[in-house]
Design a protein with these regions (language model features):
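Long, highly hydrophobic alpha-helical transmembrane signal-anchor segments
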Residues: 63-96, 100, 167-170
Length: 236
């Protein structure tokens, strides 16, 4: 038994070392500075992936169930006012599903896009980093959009329109209640959106400096006239 345990511990240690070594080898052809940046970016993007996935699946499922339930209730309800309320609720829920399906949070994919560029040389490493930095900027913009007045105005506007249709068009007071619930749910969804990307980008820029365009520089040649001849120059 002790021999078995010793062998198991050795296997775990060697396995862990191999994983760490494999990570170093994968960036062995990158410069030290680029490799350090890559590790930071990839780690943060992957760290935010699980919550973004849970958030997306949770809200998509919530609105999907709401669409089905409200549609069934609308089809079986005999009262015209209540039926209108269910129809409006189904439409709003289906809108929520459509928005999430068409525009999922970028953080949901983690660093997957970076994996499409193998770090085979410094140029490829810089391209991989460029993609990662762009993902971080995109995630940060999506995080900041939680505070956009346009986003909150849209939540209020859509639910207000639904409330007016039901309450005024069908003389059904429950339309106002549905409006309030809809606004509340919309705000919870907005503020629970993956929110750490701004902090990640700020920390990255404080540690490494502002994000940079790592695309390869082009070499250009210049010719300028001089008295009695020409001057040649090269810019890179």
């Amino acid at each position: 038994m002790p021999t078995t345990m010793t062998a198991l511990l050795c296997w775990l240690v060697l396995g862990t070392t191999a994983v760490a070594w494999g990570d170093d080898v994968s960036l062995a052809r990158c410069s030290d500075g680029t490799a350090e940046r890559l590790r930071f970016v990839e780690d943060r993007l992957e760290e935010r992936r699980p919550y973004a996935n849970y958030w997306w699946m949770g809200w998509t499922g919530f609105y999907g169930i709401g669409t089905v339930v409200s549609s069934v209730q609308a089809g079986t309800e005999g009262d015209e006012g209540k039926r209108a309320d269910y129809v409006v609720s189904a439409v709003k829920a289906s809108f929520g599903v459509g928005r999430l399906v068409l525009f999922p949070p970028t953080a949901k994919a983690g660093a997957a896009a970076m994996g499409e560029v193998a770090p085979t040389d410094e140029s490829a490493c810089r391209e991989r980093l460029r993609i990662g930095e762009e993902l971080m900027r995109t995630n940060a913009r999506e995080t900041a959009s939680r505070w956009s007045w346009k986003r909150h105005a849209a939540i209020v506007g859509i639910n207000l329109a639904g409330g007016l249709i039901v309450a005024e068009g069908f003389d059904e007071p429950r339309g106002w209640r549905s409006m309030g619930i809809g606004i509340g749910v919309g705000e919870i969804m907005t503020f629970s959106h993956p929110w750490k990307a701004e902090d990640d980008l700020t920390e990255y820029e404080q540690k490494f400096g502002a994000t940079t365009d790592y695309s390869a520089r082009k070499i250009s040649f210049e010719v300028a006239p001089l008295p009695g001849g020409l001057a040649f120059g090269m810019r890179f």
